């Protein structure tokens, strides 16, 4: 019923609660969250990274100028279609988009801070 999710190793797609999708450099990062099981402190999640497809698009036919653009991976769109059938997400309004951007920014701050701490710890090990 959900061949693309099963192909990712998700054997029980009905246990999916929600998902998030964000872009990092030239990759799209899909994170799938599962329903919390009895006795678990946190819900289980898995993360998948998909390279963005790069295309050259003609900008000006007179001067034959091309611009490199990236777009979502076709396999990822198929996975998202299946996820939407399971989670039935709400359509975001304009205010929600602003909040999503702010949430993405806060997440990025945490990721960068964590990476800096990891690198500093590695440096300490060298001393």
Swiss-Prot record:
InterPro entries: UPF0325. It holds the Pfam family DUF3461. Signal peptide: none annotated. It comes from the Bacteria. Belongs to the UPF0325 family. This is UPF0325 protein VC_2264. The lineage of its organism: Bacteria, Pseudomonadati, Pseudomonadota, Gammaproteobacteria, Vibrionales.
């Amino acid at each position: 019923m959900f061949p693309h999710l099963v192909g990712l190793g998700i054997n029980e797609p009905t246990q999916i609660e929600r998902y998030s999708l964000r872009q990092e450099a030239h990759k799209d990062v899909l994170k799938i969250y599962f329903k919390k099981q009895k006795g678990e402190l946190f819900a289980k999640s898995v993360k998948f990274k998909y390279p963005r497809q790069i295309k050259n698009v003609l900008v000006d036919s007179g001067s034959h100028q091309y611009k490199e653009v990236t777009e979502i991976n076709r396999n990822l769109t198929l996975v998202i279609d299946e996820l939407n059938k399971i989670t039935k997400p709400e359509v975001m309004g304009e205010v929600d988009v602003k909040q999503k951007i702010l949430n993405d920014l806060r997440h990025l701050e945490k990721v960068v801070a964590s990476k800096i701490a990891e690198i500093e710890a590695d440096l300490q090990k060298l001393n």
